[in-house]
């Protein structure tokens, strides 16, 4: 009997934030079930580690200079052969649910799938619009839960006489990190260990390391950390890029006049030193990131439980991966 294939992918999930890897940052018991029951990849690298090119490479099995999807802004030509097309031709039922990020419209929408329901672009964490078989519809709830609900709904309504191939793609934990309200406070009782290289001065490193605009200390946005962005211009923070309305949180030498406000609770945060501010940014970033991952682990557990209940676990290949990893404060980066 040919095996079913369940392919689950998240976005920007660092291996350090999976407890099966032993780093102690968080607990992911359901992801660990996959590792314990199969193979854990310890040396797996992305050749073009940004969302769109990585997804194109996974889908087509080709390098980006071959499939043409070389940047975040290039879209896939959906006439390309892909894994779903090959499997469907051999008798599999195929479905794609969640983050696509390879372009919208007829030339770029998913092909090779009997059913698809995808987020446009990055999509939203709460009440996301989804494009289902070419038609937009707004779904109520939290994206990680919704993507799992829709995946399970398709599985329950498929043809049970044929094997299935399901690509379940989560938006989480991509910036801006938005944990479900049930998870927002789960890491608040203790601090996350700061990496030894968090304050890297980049001496004796390549110039690109110092130039990279992804430092937790100076490049995090208000929205990254669940903070209110004040009204105003450059005095409340530099624009993230030309044309953006989002601003970076300031990192002044003397932060005693800086007040940051929690977007959810209204709590105010003040700082006496620059190092205290840097520590706050790291803790806030990490706790929101890890809390966002918690919902992924819970929902992976729902899918594994479904396989057990249906008696399909032994004949289903389950793969969990991310489109790329993430820096968790290592060398000061996110």
Question: Which sequence ranges carry the predicted segments?
Answer:
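Formylglycine-dependent sulfatase
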Residues: 1-334
């Amino acid at each position: 009997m040919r095996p079913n294939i369940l392919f689950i992918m998240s976005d920007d999930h660092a291996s350090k934030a999976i407890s099966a890897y032993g780093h102690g940052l968080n607990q992911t018991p359901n992801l660990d079930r996959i590792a314990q029951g199969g193979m854990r990849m310890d040396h797996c690298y992305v050749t073009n580690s940004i969302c769109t090119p990585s997804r194109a490479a996974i889908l087509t099995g080709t390098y980006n200079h071959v499939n043409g999807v070389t940047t975040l802004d290039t879209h896939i030509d959906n006439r390309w052969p892909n894994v779903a097309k090959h499997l469907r031709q051999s008798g599999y039922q195929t479905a794609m649910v969640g983050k696509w990020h390879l372009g919208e419209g007829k030339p770029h929408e998913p092909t090779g799938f009997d059913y698809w329901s995808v987020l446009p672009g990055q999509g939203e964490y709460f009440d996301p619009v989804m494009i289902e078989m070419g038609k937009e519809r707004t779904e109520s709830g939290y994206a990680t839960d919704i993507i799992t609900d829709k995946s399970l709904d398709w599985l329950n309504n498929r043809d049970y006489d044929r094997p299935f191939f399901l690509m379940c793609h989560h938006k989480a934990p991509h910036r801006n990190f938005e944990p479900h309200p049930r998870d927002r406070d789960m890491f608040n009782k203790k601090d996350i260990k700061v990496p030894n290289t968090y304050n890297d001065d980049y001496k004796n490193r390549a110039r690109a390391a110092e130039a990279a605009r992804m430092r937790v200390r100076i490049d995090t946005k208000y929205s990254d950390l669940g903070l209110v962005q004040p009204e105003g211009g450059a005095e409340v923070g530099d624009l993230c890029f030309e044309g953006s309305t989002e601003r970076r949180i300031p990192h002044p030498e003397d932060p005693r006049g800086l007040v940051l406000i929690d977007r959810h609770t209204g709590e105010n945060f003040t700082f006496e030193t620059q190092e205290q501010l840097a520590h706050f940014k790291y803790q806030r970033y990490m706790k929101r990131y890890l809390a966002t991952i918690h919902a992924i682990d819970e929902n992976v557990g729902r899918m594994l439980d479904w396989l057990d209940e249906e008696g399909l676990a032994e004949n289903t290949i389950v793969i969990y991966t991310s489109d790329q990893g993430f820096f968790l404060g290592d060398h000061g980066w996110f």
